[in-house]
Design a protein with these regions (language model features):
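Alpha-helical cap/lid subdomain in secreted, periplasmic
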Residues: 2-148, 152-170
Length: 170
């Protein structure tokens, strides 16, 4: 992420940056192996340290609106056949969201958390339907409903609540 900032981001001279990370950075299958707790802690620390370098670069931007996005959750609570959850992964992701929130506050940047509301919504529905998920069944990638909830949260945070945001005709 950090190494690609110049070519993929700054070279485009953005006026608004939406920054999110964490799902890939926090690892996968290792959460179901011996030493998972230590693995999660190591991945969290790496993520935190790498973000610190990126934060310094973001602080140096003039005239750029920075929005940190607490990423979508890893759904480890849905009962999905033939897809064992990676226990503890979302807790590590939530810690990443916590330091993103703190960084946004310290730097005067905007912050929007997708993880907490999507997790809460999923768990509320899972109380009646344990197989419910806002992912495509892989526990990672939001499905259409998950993306719709994220779009709602994003637009609401941008002051668009109650306003027309699209006009679609077929």
């Amino acid at each position: 992420m950090y190494r690609r900032l110049d070519g993929d981001v700054f070279s485009k001279r953005p006026t608004v940056l939406n920054v999110t990370f964490g799902m890939n950075d926090t690892g996968y299958a290792e959460y179901n192996q011996p030493g998972a707790g230590e693995f999660g802690e190591r991945r969290y620390r790496e993520c935190y340290e790498n973000y610190g370098r990126m934060e310094q670069r973001l602080q140096g931007l003039d005239g750029v609106r920075v929005v940190l996005l607490g990423g979508a959750p890893y759904d480890e609570t849905a009962q999905i056949e033939k897809n064992a959850p990676l226990r503890g992964k979302n807790a590590v992701l939530q810690r990443v969201v916590d330091f993103q929130r703190a960084s946004a506050g310290e730097n005067g940047w905007e912050f929007l958390d997708f993880n907490t509301p999507l997790t809460e919504l999923s768990q509320r529905v899972q109380a009646d339907d344990p197989s419910f998920t806002l992912t495509m069944g892989d526990r990672i990638h939001p499905d259409n409903d998950g993306h719709m909830v994220m779009a709602y949260l994003y637009l609401k945070a941008q002051g668009m609540a109650g306003k027309k945001v699209a006009d679609v005709r077929i």
